[in-house]
Amino acid sequence: MAYRILVVEDDEDIGDLLEESLTRAGYEVLRAKDGKRALQLVNDSLDLVILDIMMPGISGIETCQHIRKSSNVPILFLTARSSTLDKTEGLLAGGDDYMTKPFSEEELHARVIAQLRRYTIYQEKKEQEETFLIGGKLRVSEEFNEVWKEEKQIKLSDLEYRILKLLMNKRNKIFSAQNIYESVWGQPYFYCSNNTVMVHIRKLRSKIEDDPARPVYIKTEWGRGYRFGAS
């Protein structure tokens, strides 16, 4: 299967050149002319993003920061901005490499190959090391603190993740609010702590349930507590 590369470039001629060159090298190329469209195309099937900085609307720096909230896909900046400050800003925003225009196709291909090689090694290592908790459509990574629902990653806070992991590790066991608070927060339970747990359960349901009003994953056992309900 060919590697999939997203080219984010508002200049039509440069975008065409990149697409033609990368396609000729055997890659599958997707195109976006701005950051907004790029964010719509970013998903788990991408292997590399080639990203301009000066674009209409969302800049390449902002686009990179948004991508980094949910994805570790390699990002190669390709831009006319060539100062040391520009390069530093791009790398600190989450970029993995930085090239300036004008560029040679030979160097571009070398950098693409290097990024894809590193990413492939990272993915293989991650698959070997990673163990999951699975329930229904949910898949929870215990090593990387990641939660997936089918093929979509769900962003949880650290406390929400720890609540979900606690419940999934003991299927069908009922955890009282006190059990959850003392296990997750690691602090003595007080009466007002019940509201804290309820608020976080509600937020967690809003992110993982198809219908939070009729939860499938986080079940309430009235007067007793909560349990993970999906098999």
From Swiss-Prot:
Record Gene3D superfamilies: 3.40.50.2300, 6.10.250.690, Winged helix-like DNA-binding domain superfamily/Winged helix DNA-binding domain
InterPro entries listed in its UniProt record: CheY-like_superfamily (IPR011006), OmpR/PhoB-type_DNA-bd (IPR001867), Sig_transdc_resp-reg_C-effctor (IPR016032), Sig_transdc_resp-reg_receiver (IPR001789), WalR-like (IPR039420), WH-like_DNA-bd_sf (IPR036388)
First-listed, main subcellular location of the protein, grouped into a coarse class: cytoplasm
GO cellular component: cytosol; protein-DNA complex
Keywords assigned by UniProt, alphabetized: Cytoplasm, DNA-binding, Phosphoprotein, Transcription, Transcription regulation, Two-component regulatory system
One protein family per Pfam: Trans_reg_C
Keyword RNA-binding attributed: no
DNA-binding span(s): 129-230
GO biological process, one term: regulation of DNA-templated transcription
Domain of life: Bacteria
Modification(s) after translation: Phosphorylated by YrkQ.
GO molecular function: phosphorelay response regulator activity; transcription cis-regulatory region binding
Subcellular location: Cytoplasm
Residue numbers bearing the 4-aspartylphosphate modification: D52
Domain (Response regulatory): residue spans on this chain: 4-116
Purpose of the protein: Member of the two-component regulatory system YrkQ/YrkP.
Listed name of the protein: Uncharacterized transcriptional regulatory protein YrkP
Organism: Bacillus subtilis (strain 168)
Gene: yrkP
